[in-house]
């Protein structure tokens, strides 16, 4: 089966927006008009096709990105739905990674909201060409011109206005198309599927003429010949104008601005036309970059079917009917069912079922090509952010950075029946989300879950309850501290136990010292002349390593330890692997007591993007949190503050930041390194954990 659409007719897009800008409703309408979804779902009824997790339907917010394929004007459009909530920015970044272009939706009443600024800056980071869609123009208080001004002021973008609204609020009936120079009016009874082209209303002719002139002047800047011709008094024809607008959009010189009301079924078809006309195909973006298996030598893949196959797994989700699904963007080559691929882990993966997803219905396919976004069922080794590639030409596409989790909670199942279900649920959730980890506490036997933020863990506990029917008690959030030795020590430790019959005996002489930061547990065997038989040495290491992991002073792991096993003694009858393991444990405990312990805490790299007005407040607040300001910078018309702040001082920060900046600043934080806790804070930590 050959490719159904040539690559230049592909559009891989995402719709990004603030929580209530009508992103899901817009996607719904796109699916309805492109003939893929036959009943219009409404978010406020909780039936939207894209929001397919129960939780999303109830909260009316989109949490996971579902990928959907639809067709328009002989083009194939793959839509990736992105979440709009600040704690899911990792999901947004993940979807931006695999998009070629984006539509940013704005609420026509509220304009550019804080989360819109956040996703806009993330799209800048990944160099995603985009256009703006001002939605909800039927609502009381909607103001199109004010939104356009905010796009200039708050985002620092140059808007290229393609459409003007005819009427506003309850009298909003259609649009003036400035490129084609005509009006479009929708017919109510057809649910917006039918519309008519008409002449521009008399009372709008002057306004439309001025706006069209501005648009043409913006477009002809893209081409010297067009500019000269225009200055001689010749207007570009429609095809030339579209080509110039496309060129400027792909070059980030301006952003096309459209408008409508998705809920009232007006403006969606022009939006689809603009996606086709102005957003990039996979051929318009640079070749995907990566490295060879050595992790250093740069490599790349062109968007061609004949190139070696390469794809990026960007999302794993559990489907109630198919099981685990891995969503992958194919960058190059051709993928056939039944073939074996290399995963980054240098393991082979067999491609079993391959599906094209439409929100939550699915279609089995036999093969897929460069530019496709597909769901693969039954992959065993692949996790989010991994590359899948042809074994003959391995490549690692730049790996998405997933920070280590920094906040932990204990979770306890409420009943015996919940115990087993909880284990299954947590493992499934951890497979889907690389920034979520699960472990158990040796001493208390509690299950500890770790994640990126308070809301992150809250949502996961909630999913455990809904999807897996597990009821659990949840503890308060804790910082993951570490312990570190103060100085090197040398000691002899003897373990002796005699109780009739054979006893236990082991003796070791060890030197234990603080290692370099980040070196982990290092064990060096320097025993000469068989003073400890070879088969017992791994037991000494095991005992010492496990004791270090269990901690000494406050029960957090002792990290970066270097142990030299210098000498020892054994007994022919009483010595055994177990006896030497116990000896190792005792030696590590005693070494920690003699060396003394300092406490290390996670230090976060925090970036706050704030309007200029609040810069002083943001810096003052950072200093009060033991933060060290690394620098400030301007980005567009916002100020960026970078600081290193202990995680312990960042709990509840999101709410405080919102309150003193009226919700206009946003922050991102990721783990940077562990550092020593100041003495006064260390005393507080010990007292709290004692």
Swiss-Prot record:
- For this chain's UniProt record, which GO biological process terms are given? ribosome disassembly
Q: Which GO terms describe its cellular component?
A: cytoplasm
Alphabetical list of InterPro entries matching this protein:
EF-G-like_DII, EFG_II, EFG_III, EFG_III/V, EFG_IV, EFG_V, EFG_V-like, G_TR_CS
Its keywords, alphabetically, are: Cytoplasm, Elongation factor, GTP-binding, Nucleotide-binding, Protein biosynthesis
Where does the protein principally reside?
A: cytoplasm
Subcellular localization, as worded in the UniProt entry = Cytoplasm
- Residues annotated to bind GTP: 17-24, 81-85, 135-138
Q: Which Pfam families match?
A: EF-G_D2, EFG_C, EFG_III, EFG_IV, GTP_EFTU
Q: Describe the location of the tr-type G domain by residue ranges.
A: 8-283
Record-level Gene Ontology MF annotations: GTP binding; GTPase activity; translation elongation factor activity
The entry's function note states: Catalyzes the GTP-dependent ribosomal translocation step during translation elongation. During this step, the ribosome changes from the pre-translocational (PRE) to the post-translocational (POST) state as the newly formed A-site-bound peptidyl-tRNA and P-site-bound deacylated tRNA move to the P and E sites, respectively. Catalyzes the coordinated movement of the two tRNA molecules, the mRNA and conformational changes in the ribosome.
Name the family.
Answer: Belongs to the TRAFAC class translation factor GTPase superfamily. Classic translation factor GTPase family. EF-G/EF-2 subfamily.
The UniProt entry, under NCBIfam families, shows: EF-G (TIGR00484), PRK12740.1-3 (NF009379), PRK12740.1-5 (NF009381), small_GTP (TIGR00231)
Q: What is this protein called in UniProt? A: Elongation factor G
Could you tell me the gene encoding this protein?
A: fusA
């Amino acid at each position: 089966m050959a490719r159904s659409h040539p690559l230049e007719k592909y559009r891989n897009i995402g719709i990004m927006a603030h929580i209530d800008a009508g992103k899901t409703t817009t996607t719904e309408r796109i699916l309805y008009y492109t003939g893929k979804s036959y009943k219009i779902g409404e978010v406020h009824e909780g039936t939207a096709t894209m929001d397919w997790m129960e939780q999303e339907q109830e909260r009316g917010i989109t949490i996971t990105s579902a990928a959907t394929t639809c067709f328009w004007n002989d083009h194939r459009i793959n839509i990736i739905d992105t979440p709009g909530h600040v704690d899911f920015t990792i999901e947004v970044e993940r979807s931006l990674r695999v998009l070629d272009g984006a539509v940013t939706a704005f609420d026509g009443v509220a304009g550019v909201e804080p989360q819109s600024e956040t996703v806009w800056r993330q799209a800048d980071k990944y160099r995603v060409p985009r256009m703006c869609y001002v939605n909800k123009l039927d609502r009381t208080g909607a103001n199109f011109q004010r939104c356009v001004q905010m796009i200039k002021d708050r985002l620092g973008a140059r808007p290229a206005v393609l459409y003007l609204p005819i009427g506003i609020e309850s009298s909003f009936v259609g649009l003036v198309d400035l490129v084609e120079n005509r009006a479009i009016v929708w017919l109510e009874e057809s649910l917006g599927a039918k519309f008519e082209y008409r002449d521009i209303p008399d009372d709008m002719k002057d306004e439309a003429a001025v706006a069209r002139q501005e648009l043409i002047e913006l477009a002809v800047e893209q081409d010297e010949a067009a500019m000269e011709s225009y200055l001689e008094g010749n207007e570009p024809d429609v095809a030339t104008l579209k080509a110039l607008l496309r060129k400027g959009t792909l070059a980030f010189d301006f952003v096309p601005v459209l408008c409508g009301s998705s809920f009232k079924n007006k403006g969606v078809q022009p939006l689809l036309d603009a996606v086709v006309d102005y957003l990039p195909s996979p051929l318009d973006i640079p070749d995907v970059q990566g490295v060879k298996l050595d992790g250093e030598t740069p490599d790349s893949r062109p968007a061609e079917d004949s190139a070696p196959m390469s794809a990026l797994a960007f999302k794993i989700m559990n489907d109630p009917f198919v099981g685990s699904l891995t969503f992958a963007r194919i960058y190059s080559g051709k993928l056939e069912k039944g073939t074996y691929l290399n995963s980054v882990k240098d393991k082979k993966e067999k491609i079993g079922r391959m599906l094209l997803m439409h929100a939550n219905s699915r279609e089995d396919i036999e093969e897929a090509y460069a530019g496709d976004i597909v769901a693969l069922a039954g992959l065993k080794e692949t996790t989010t952010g991994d590359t899948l590639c042809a074994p003959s030409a391995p490549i690692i596409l730049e790996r998405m950075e997933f920070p280590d989790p920094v906040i932990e909670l204990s979770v306890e199942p409420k009943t015996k029946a919940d115990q087993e279900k909880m284990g299954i649920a947590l493992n499934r959730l951890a497979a889907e989300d690389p920034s979520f980890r699960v472990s158990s506490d040796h001493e208390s036997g509690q299950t500890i879950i770790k994640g990126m933020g308070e809301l992150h863990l809250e949502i996961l506990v909630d999913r455990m309850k809904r999807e897996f029917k597990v009821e659990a008690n949840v503890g308060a959030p804790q910082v993951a501290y570490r312990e570190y030795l103060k100085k090197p020590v040398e000691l002899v430790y003897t373990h002796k136990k005699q109780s009739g019959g054979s006893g236990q005996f082991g003796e070791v002489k060890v030197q234990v010292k603080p290692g370099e930061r980040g070196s982990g547990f290092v064990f060096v065997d320097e025993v000469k002349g068989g003073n400890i038989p070879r088969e017992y040495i791994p037991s000494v290491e095991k005992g010492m390593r496990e004791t270090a992991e269990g901690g000494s002073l406050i029960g957090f792991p002792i990290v970066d330890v270097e142990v030299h096993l210098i000498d020892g003694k054994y007994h022919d009858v009483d010595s055994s692997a177990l006896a030497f393991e116990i000896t190792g444990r005792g030696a590590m405990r005693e070494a920690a007591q003699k060396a003394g312990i300092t406490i290390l805490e996670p230090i976060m790299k925090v970036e706050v993007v704030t309007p200029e007005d609040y810069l002083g407040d943001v810096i003052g607040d950072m200093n009060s949190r033991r933060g060290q300001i690394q620098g400030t910078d301007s980005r567009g018309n916002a100020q960026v503050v970078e600081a290193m702040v202990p995680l312990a001082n960042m709990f509840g920060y999101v709410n405080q930041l919102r309150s003193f900046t009226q919700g206009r600043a946003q922050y991102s934080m990721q783990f940077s390194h562990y550092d020593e806790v100041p003495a006064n804070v260390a005393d507080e930590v010990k007292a709290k954990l004692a």
